């Protein structure tokens, strides 16, 4: 009995210290990374590794019909399908206080997610991404820059190369580019966001003058950053991109 009393006294004595130490641990973030057109969750593997090493929780889902889910592709996959992919991930994994990241076409998807689950998102990153207003489609945002061969409900951009080994970019469901997105929720419009443009430093001035997504982000008062990179910095310059994703 005496030994038990001694143990209990020691426990009580040191409990405040233990509790205090735990409270001082840095709270990390939960990232949901949404890939772009023709890509997949595999696109984020390098970024995932870098963020995870720092203790962040990372989800990198693949949108229906793409990547390792290419066997599910069909002509009726639309933007709503892809938005639901992410909405359901958030609901079923019971995620909260999310850092939502969208690359390229993924900007259309995360815009729809922001509109449906604004209370779940602490910050959004648009990485060289489409920034639509309410009622705009990807075609409306990109205009003349999307003029691809279409066959059996799929688009075939010029960067596809079937000779490359897997993982690789694959044909993309065409309806995802023509469906208009909803972005009319008042809370969604107040979510803090950062727009990061991937472009060589020598072309920044020109890019800002012609890029309507950049201009819409600026008009909304979002933070604007640039990264000297090609369009797929998550593949070609992951270390630099990761540094930007943890600063907001």
Region spans (language model):
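Residue in the alpha/beta-hydrolase core beta-strand immediately N-terminal to the catalytic nucleophile
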Residues: 62, 99, 122-125
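Conserved acidic catalytic loop of the alpha/beta-hydrolase fold
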Residues: 83-98
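Conserved loop-alpha-helix segment in the C-terminal half of the alpha/beta-hydrolase fold
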Residues: 200-228, 235, 248
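Active-site glycine-rich loops that stabilize anionic/oxyanionic intermediates
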Residues: 36-40, 104
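Flexible "cap/lid" loop of the alpha/beta hydrolase fold
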Residues: 75, 115, 120-121, 125-157, ...
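Gly/Ala-rich beta-loop-alpha elbow adjacent to hydrolase catalytic centers
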Residues: 101-102, 106, 110
């Amino acid at each position: 009995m005496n030994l038990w009393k001694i143990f209990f006294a020691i426990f009580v004595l040191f409990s405040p210290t233990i509790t205090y130490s735990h409270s001082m641990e840095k709270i990390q973030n939960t990232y949901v990374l949404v890939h772009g057109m023709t890509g997949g969750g595999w696109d984020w593997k390098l970024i995932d590794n870098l963020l995870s090493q720092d203790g962040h929780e990372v989800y990198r889902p693949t949108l229906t019909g793409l990547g390792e889910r290419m066997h599910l592709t069909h002509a009726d996959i639309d933007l709503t399908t892809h938005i639901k992919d992410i909405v359901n991930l958030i609901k079923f994994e019971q995620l909260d206080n999310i850092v939502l990241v969208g690359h390229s076409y993924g900007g259309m998807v995360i815009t729809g997610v922001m509109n449906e689950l604004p209370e779940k998102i602490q910050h959004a990153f648009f990485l060289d991404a489409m920034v639509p207003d309410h009622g705009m489609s990807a075609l409306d945002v990109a205009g003349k820059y999307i003029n691809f061969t279409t066959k059996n409900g799929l688009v075939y951009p010029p960067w596809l190369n079937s000779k490359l080994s897997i993982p690789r970019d694959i044909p993309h469901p065409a309806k995802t580019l023509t469906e208009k997105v909803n972005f009319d929720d008042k809370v969604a419009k107040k979510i803090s966001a950062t727009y990061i443009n991937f472009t060589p430093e020598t072309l920044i001035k020109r890019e800002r003058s012609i890029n309507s997504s950049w201009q819409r982000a600026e008009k909304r008062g979002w933070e604007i950053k640039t990264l000297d990179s090609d369009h797929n910095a998550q593949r070609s310059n992951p270390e630099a991109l990761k540094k930007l994703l943890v600063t907001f």
